[in-house]
Regions:
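Broad hydrophobic/π-residue packing in well-ordered secondary structure
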Residues: 22, 60-64, 110, 116
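Small/polar-rich, solvent-exposed N-terminal microdomains that initiate assembly or binding
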Residues: 1-47, 69, 81, 85-86
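Short hydrophobic/aromatic beta-strand micro-patches
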Residues: 40, 58-60
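Short amphipathic alpha-helical segments
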Residues: 53-55
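Extracellular/virion structural assembly segments
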Residues: 43, 62-79
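Short, charged interaction patches at domain edges and termini
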Residues: 1-15, 42-50, 89-130
Length: 130
Protein backbone atom coordinates (compact mmCIF):
# COMPACT_ATOMS: atom_id res chain seq x y z
CA UNK A 1 0.00 0.00 0.00
CA UNK A 2 1.19 3.55 -0.70
CA UNK A 3 0.84 6.19 2.01
CA UNK A 4 1.74 9.87 2.25
CA UNK A 5 4.11 10.95 5.02
CA UNK A 6 5.75 14.18 6.12
CA UNK A 7 9.30 14.84 5.01
CA UNK A 8 12.21 15.23 7.42
CA UNK A 9 12.02 19.03 7.24
CA UNK A 10 15.08 19.57 9.44
CA UNK A 11 17.23 17.56 7.03
CA UNK A 12 15.70 19.23 3.94
CA UNK A 13 16.50 22.67 5.36
CA UNK A 14 20.01 21.47 6.28
CA UNK A 15 20.53 20.31 2.69
CA UNK A 16 19.28 23.67 1.37
CA UNK A 17 21.76 25.59 3.56
CA UNK A 18 24.82 23.30 3.71
CA UNK A 19 26.70 24.78 0.75
CA UNK A 20 26.48 28.29 2.23
CA UNK A 21 26.75 27.99 6.04
CA UNK A 22 27.81 25.40 8.60
CA UNK A 23 24.49 23.86 9.59
CA UNK A 24 23.34 21.14 12.01
CA UNK A 25 20.07 19.43 12.84
CA UNK A 26 19.10 18.52 16.40
CA UNK A 27 20.83 17.43 18.52
CA UNK A 28 23.73 19.85 18.29
CA UNK A 29 26.96 17.81 18.28
CA UNK A 30 29.18 18.08 21.36
CA UNK A 31 32.10 19.62 19.43
CA UNK A 32 30.18 21.76 16.93
CA UNK A 33 31.98 24.20 14.65
CA UNK A 34 31.29 27.92 14.88
CA UNK A 35 29.86 30.03 13.46
CA UNK A 36 26.95 27.70 12.73
CA UNK A 37 23.18 27.42 12.35
CA UNK A 38 21.02 24.85 14.16
CA UNK A 39 17.73 23.77 12.52
CA UNK A 40 14.93 22.66 14.88
CA UNK A 41 11.35 21.66 14.01
CA UNK A 42 8.92 23.17 16.50
CA UNK A 43 5.56 22.11 15.09
CA UNK A 44 3.42 22.18 12.01
CA UNK A 45 0.18 21.28 10.28
CA UNK A 46 -0.81 18.98 7.45
CA UNK A 47 -3.50 19.42 4.82
CA UNK A 48 -3.94 16.90 2.01
CA UNK A 49 -0.54 16.64 0.29
CA UNK A 50 0.96 19.81 1.82
CA UNK A 51 2.72 20.25 5.17
CA UNK A 52 3.41 23.55 6.90
CA UNK A 53 6.29 23.26 9.37
CA UNK A 54 7.33 25.74 12.03
CA UNK A 55 11.11 25.64 12.34
CA UNK A 56 13.63 27.64 14.32
CA UNK A 57 17.02 28.63 12.97
CA UNK A 58 19.56 29.43 15.69
CA UNK A 59 22.79 31.15 14.60
CA UNK A 60 25.75 30.83 16.97
CA UNK A 61 28.84 33.03 16.65
CA UNK A 62 31.43 34.93 18.70
CA UNK A 63 29.53 38.25 18.61
CA UNK A 64 25.92 39.39 18.33
CA UNK A 65 26.73 41.09 15.01
CA UNK A 66 28.27 37.91 13.55
CA UNK A 67 25.35 35.77 14.75
CA UNK A 68 22.80 38.18 13.29
CA UNK A 69 24.65 38.38 9.96
CA UNK A 70 24.88 34.57 9.79
CA UNK A 71 21.17 34.29 10.53
CA UNK A 72 20.33 36.85 7.84
CA UNK A 73 22.43 34.90 5.31
CA UNK A 74 20.76 31.60 6.29
CA UNK A 75 17.29 33.15 5.94
CA UNK A 76 18.19 34.64 2.55
CA UNK A 77 19.56 31.31 1.30
CA UNK A 78 16.48 29.44 2.56
CA UNK A 79 14.17 31.93 0.84
CA UNK A 80 16.11 31.65 -2.43
CA UNK A 81 16.16 27.84 -2.23
CA UNK A 82 12.41 27.60 -1.59
CA UNK A 83 11.69 30.00 -4.47
CA UNK A 84 13.83 27.72 -6.65
CA UNK A 85 11.79 24.71 -5.38
CA UNK A 86 14.90 23.06 -3.87
CA UNK A 87 14.27 19.41 -2.99
CA UNK A 88 10.85 19.09 -1.38
CA UNK A 89 10.75 22.67 -0.04
CA UNK A 90 8.20 24.96 -1.69
CA UNK A 91 7.81 28.16 0.34
CA UNK A 92 9.17 29.89 3.43
CA UNK A 93 8.05 32.87 5.51
CA UNK A 94 10.08 34.35 8.36
CA UNK A 95 7.71 34.89 11.30
CA UNK A 96 10.09 36.40 13.85
CA UNK A 97 13.72 37.35 14.29
CA UNK A 98 15.29 37.87 17.72
CA UNK A 99 18.59 38.10 19.54
CA UNK A 100 18.77 35.90 22.63
CA UNK A 101 22.17 37.03 23.88
CA UNK A 102 24.32 34.16 25.17
CA UNK A 103 23.99 30.62 23.85
CA UNK A 104 22.68 28.30 26.62
CA UNK A 105 24.86 25.45 25.32
CA UNK A 106 28.07 27.51 25.17
CA UNK A 107 27.77 30.80 27.09
CA UNK A 108 30.90 32.17 25.36
CA UNK A 109 28.88 32.33 22.09
CA UNK A 110 26.09 34.69 21.05
CA UNK A 111 22.80 33.33 19.71
CA UNK A 112 20.31 34.88 17.28
CA UNK A 113 17.18 32.98 16.28
CA UNK A 114 14.38 33.16 13.74
CA UNK A 115 11.09 31.31 13.51
CA UNK A 116 10.21 30.29 9.95
CA UNK A 117 7.14 28.70 8.38
CA UNK A 118 8.22 26.24 5.67
CA UNK A 119 5.78 24.66 3.21
CA UNK A 120 6.65 21.31 1.65
CA UNK A 121 4.98 18.54 -0.29
CA UNK A 122 4.44 15.25 1.50
CA UNK A 123 6.16 12.20 0.06
CA UNK A 124 4.62 8.89 -0.92
CA UNK A 125 6.13 5.69 0.43
CA UNK A 126 5.18 2.05 -0.03
CA UNK A 127 4.54 -0.06 3.04
CA UNK A 128 3.70 -3.72 3.35
CA UNK A 129 1.13 -5.30 5.62
CA UNK A 130 2.51 -7.14 8.60
Amino acid sequence: MNIEVSIDVEDEVRLALKDYVTVYCRPLPENFLTPCVLVEQMGGTSSNTIDNFVIRLGARAATDAEALQLLRVALGVLEAQTKAQFGKLRYSITNSLASWGSDPVRPDLKLCTATVLVTAHRETIAISES
